[in-house]
């Protein structure tokens, strides 16, 4: 099992698919990295030499923000919005949808499980 950016990459998958196990690398970036390093599309991870794995590591370190650094940056961006007190920050603080979705009937994922309300007693 190759270890890239602190993540164990599955050995039996194609390189493009395996790179997507790293947080911050999707299909587009995975294809870009393999082209930059010069690895064929169909090659599997267990077929890579140590030199090729090292080249992939260096390409990711140089050009992409992944894993912990990316998570930290996203968290800092959300914290900055909350500290500013802007509308988006308030929505984050109250755990409500940020991008204008309706909340009257939906948004259960963001708001959490429904709270029981006592009905009218007869």
UniProtKB/Swiss-Prot annotation:
What InterPro entries does the record tag this protein with?
A: Rbsml_uS13_C, Ribosomal_uS13, Ribosomal_uS13-like_H2TH, Ribosomal_uS13_bac-type, Ribosomal_uS13_CS
Q: Which SUPFAM superfamilies match?
A: S13-like H2TH domain
Q: Where is the signal peptide?
A: none
Q: Where is this region: Disordered?
A: 97-122
One annotated GO molecular function: rRNA binding
Its BP terms in the Gene Ontology are: translation
Q: Which UniProt keywords apply?
A: Ribonucleoprotein, Ribosomal protein, RNA-binding, rRNA-binding, tRNA-binding
One Pfam match, given by its short name, reads: Ribosomal_S13
Extract the Gene3D superfamilies matched here.
Answer: 1.10.8.50, 30s ribosomal protein s13, domain 2 (4.10.910.10)
Q: For this UniProt entry, which segments traverse the membrane? A: none
Q: Which GO terms describe its cellular component?
A: cytosol; small ribosomal subunit
Q: How does it assemble?
A: Part of the 30S ribosomal subunit. Forms a loose heterodimer with protein S19. Forms two bridges to the 50S subunit in the 70S ribosome.
HAMAP family linked? Ribosomal_uS13
> Which protein family is it in?
Belongs to the universal ribosomal protein uS13 family.
The job of this chain, per UniProt, is described as: Located at the top of the head of the 30S subunit, it contacts several helices of the 16S rRNA. In the 70S ribosome it contacts the 23S rRNA (bridge B1a) and protein L5 of the 50S subunit (bridge B1b), connecting the 2 subunits; these bridges are implicated in subunit movement. Contacts the tRNAs in the A and P-sites.
PANTHER family per the record? Answer: 30S RIBOSOMAL PROTEIN S13/40S RIBOSOMAL PROTEIN S18, SMALL RIBOSOMAL SUBUNIT PROTEIN US13M
User: What is the protein's name according to its record?
Assistant: Small ribosomal subunit protein uS13
């Amino acid at each position: 099992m190759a270890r890239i950016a602190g993540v164990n990459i599955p050995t039996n998958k194609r390189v493009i698919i395996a790179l997507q196990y790293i947080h911050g690398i999707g299909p587009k970036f995975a294809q870009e990295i393999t082209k930059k390093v010069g690895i064929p599309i169909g090659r599997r991870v267990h077929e890579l030499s140590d030199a090729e794995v090292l080249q992939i590591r260096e390409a990711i370190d140089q050009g992409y923000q992944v894993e912990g650094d990316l998570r930290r940056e996203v968290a800092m961006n959300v914290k900055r919005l909350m500290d500013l007190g802007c509308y988006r920050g308030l929505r984050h603080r109250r755990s409500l949808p940020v991008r204008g979705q309706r909340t009257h009937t939906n948004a259960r994922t963001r708001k959490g499980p429904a709270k029981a309300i006592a009905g009218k007693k007869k």
